[in-house]
């Protein structure tokens, strides 16, 4: 918890909201989203129906995004993650850690875990 407060740049033991959501596609789990949110930027976060909207969409409306940071890592998932994502054996995950800024401060930090066999990342950029 102290590390998380430090990541947000707030005092240790400050309140943070937390949500854990498993996202499905064609009845298969494809993402485990664990998100922490700064309450003063999204005070109604814990009352939102995330069956109707995503945390990202909600946060984009109440605390418009100014900056986003992505960190990608290949990791071996913990047992809990493996079960929630219906993963087999020693399959690795792609872990994306996303920090989002709004109103000059970090609004949320999300840990997004994707089963290695069910996720592909691609991009196309122009210089």
Task: List where the protein language model places each region.
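C-terminal all-alpha effector/ligand-binding and dimerization domain
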Residues: 1-127
């Amino acid at each position: 918890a102290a590390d998380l407060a430090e990541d947000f740049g707030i005092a240790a033991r400050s309140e943070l909201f937390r949500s854990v959501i498993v996202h499905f596609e064609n009845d298969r789990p494809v993402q485990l989203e664990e998100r922490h949110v700064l309450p003063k930027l999204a005070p109604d976060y814990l009352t939102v129906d995330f069956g109707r909207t995503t945390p990202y969409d909600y946060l984009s409306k109440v605390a418009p995004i100014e900056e986003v940071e992505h960190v990608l890592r290949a990791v071996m998932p913990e047992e809990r993650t493996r079960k929630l994502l219906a993963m087999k054996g020693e399959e690795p995950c792609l872990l994306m850690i996303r920090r989002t800024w709004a109103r000059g401060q970090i609004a949320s930090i999300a840990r997004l875990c994707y089963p290695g066999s069910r996720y592909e990342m691609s991009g196309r950029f122009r210089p």
